[in-house]
């Protein structure tokens, strides 16, 4: 399913925002969890809609959206404002996996046993 629509934005080096357009949902209608590097976002409307619509074009259907994250991605925060759910993600790269510069002609260490 393609609902709800979303954006992924790089905000800084190693920081990202996942934004989902979920107009009409409240904090209590949402469930966000991560398990085995899969981020799951579920939305269920908690209240009955008793309005007598002439036209209903704004979707308020339940949804379940999943995102597979790299092992180095950590979910840091979530916020709901103006119908946009924003989830902050950080790419935490271990020191041993970070690129390092190798000097040419630098000091050499001899290994002795």
Model-derived features: where do they sit?
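Alpha-crystallin/small heat shock protein
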Residues: 1-113
